[in-house]
Every structure is written in C-alpha cells, then in structure tokens.
C-alpha cells in the first residue's frame, strides 16, 4: 500500500525565505498570544510554527525562526513599555497607551531596567528557545525524519510515512517538551537560590525532579492540540505556500475572541 506524499518544501521555494516568513508569523503570535485557558490549559500558536519549521527547514533554520521571534517580541515589548510609561507621565494618548500595554505584557514591570540587563535577558530567552527547537530538530533528523526534505512528488509506502515522519515527529515533540520544561524549572529554582555546597546541589536536583514530575502531565495537556495544528500547517504549506501560517492563525484568533467575550 502506498500513499502520495507532497514535498513539504516546494522546489520553487527558498528555505531561508520560508524560515524568515515563519519567524515573522511566530513574532506576531508572541506579541499577541493566541490562547484558550480552562484552569491550567493553554494553547498558543507559536509552538506549532516552530515545530513546523523544525520539520520543513532543518535544525539551523528552525533555531533562526525561534530565536528571531523571541528576541523580536521581547525587544518590542520592552520598547513598548518604555514608550507607554513616557506617554503616561505626560498624560497623552490614552488609547495608544492601552495598545502599548497589550504589546508590552510582562515587560511593563521591567521598563526601567537598564538596557544592558534587558539585552542579556533577551539574548538568554532567545538562545534557550533556539536550543530547545534545534535539539528537537536534530533528534528528528537523527532518528530518520526525512520525508519533509524531499523536493519532488513521490509515492512512498505508508509504513515509510510512519517510520520517516510520524514517529520521528512525535519523538522530537516529546524531546522539545522535556527540554522546555527542564529549562523552565531550572530557571525558577536557580532564580530563587543558587546551590553552593553538596547538600544544596542535592536539594536542587531533588526539587527539579519533583517539579518535573508535577509539571509534565500539565504541560502534556497544554500541548495536546498543538501537534494536529502543526500537521495542518505542514499540509497547507504544500498547497498554499508561505501564507499557510495565516490560514492557521485566523481560526485561532477567532477562537480567542469567542473565549474572551
């Protein structure tokens, strides 16, 4: 039994161009996150974009997508917070202040921080996201994920679709989830108290283990709907091209508006 598999990177498309377009989509979604929350459940459109980049463009370009999106969104958030505070001090343009507050997000509380600290924080956030996506992309390639690299229309046995795409993709997704959770947990713990002696390090690793066990089931629930969205983006990319991201973002924007009302 065979199935027709369309190239996920059309021959006429440029990989670097596609990576920059996906980075722009991820940047927009970082500025105005699309989420649906029920207790601890959250869905964001940014992760499917970087996962699709991981499959479509390979490790280096996927890291570029994640890093540019996070760095751009963080930098824009800080600048928006600075402008908003200036306008507020002058009591000018209240509507623009509200718009800037939405973009600034958590950076509103850090608007007065020195530029050197902000740059270090932005580079740290961007590099962490890039490393997580890059590691997942390397794992995807290492365990046989290669269907997305075909540049022609081919007929492939269904078994090959599973061994060279579906299975590697979900293993890479699990790796991304684990890396992302570990880095967040370590950042939280190290931010509270840095280990100094052997006993501190033992407590540090024990707490990391406990938090990881507690957070993984919650994170798995949060990421539950993201693989299907990623697969939808990959499918649409074949037939629609680089604007496939907009096709996916539209329904999520409508869904968020419905939930927020």
Task: Give the ranges of each region predicted by the language model.
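Short, hydrophobic transmembrane alpha-helix segments
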Residues: 2-16, 31-39
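Membrane-embedded alpha-helical segments in integral membrane proteins
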Residues: 1-9, 53-54, 137-145, 229-231
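Hydrophobic, membrane-inserted alpha-helices
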Residues: 1-3, 26, 45-51, 224-233, ...
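Alpha-helical membrane segments and adjacent membrane-interface helices in multi-pass membrane proteins
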Residues: 19, 23-141
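Interfacial "cap-and-anchor" motif at the non-cytosolic start of specific transmembrane alpha-helices
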Residues: 186-261
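Alpha-helical transmembrane segments
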Residues: 53-55, 59-64, 157-178
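Transmembrane alpha-helical segments that form the membrane-embedded catalytic/substrate-channel core
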Residues: 27-33, 170-190, 254-261
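Transmembrane helix interruption/hinge and helix-loop junction motifs
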Residues: 10-12, 54-65, 235-244
């Amino acid at each position: 039994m065979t199935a027709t598999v369309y190239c996920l990177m059309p021959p006429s498309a440029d990989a670097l161009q596609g990576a920059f377009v996906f980075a722009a989509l991820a940047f927009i979604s970082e500025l105005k996150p699309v989420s649906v929350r029920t207790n601890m459940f959250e869905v964001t459109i940014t992760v499917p974009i970087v996962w699709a980049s991981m499959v479509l463009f390979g490790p280096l370009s996927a890291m570029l997508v994640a890093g540019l999106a996070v760095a751009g969104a963080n930098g824009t958030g800080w600048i928006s917070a600075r402008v908003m505070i200036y306008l507020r001090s002058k009591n000018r343009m209240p509507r623009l202040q509200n718009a800037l507050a939405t973009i600034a997000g958590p950076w509103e509380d850090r608007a007065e921080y020195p530029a050197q600290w902000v740059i270090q924080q932005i580079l740290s956030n961007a590099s962490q996201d890039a490393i997580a996506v890059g590691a997942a992309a390397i794992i995807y390639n290492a365990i046989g994920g290669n269907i997305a690299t075909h540049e022609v229309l081919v007929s492939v046995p269904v078994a090959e679709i599973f061994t060279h795409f579906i299975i590697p993709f979900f293993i890479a997704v699990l790796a991304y989830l684990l890396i992302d959770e570990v880095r967040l947990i370590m950042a939280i713990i190290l931010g509270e108290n840095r280990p100094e002696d052997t006993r501190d390090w033992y407590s540090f690793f024990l707490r990391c283990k406990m938090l990881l066990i507690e957070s993984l089931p919650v994170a798995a629930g949060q990421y539950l709907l993201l693989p299907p969205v990623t697969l939808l983006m990959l499918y649409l990319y074949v037939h629609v091209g680089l604007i496939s991201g907009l096709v996916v973002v539209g329904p999520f924007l409508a869904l968020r508006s419905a939930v927020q009302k």
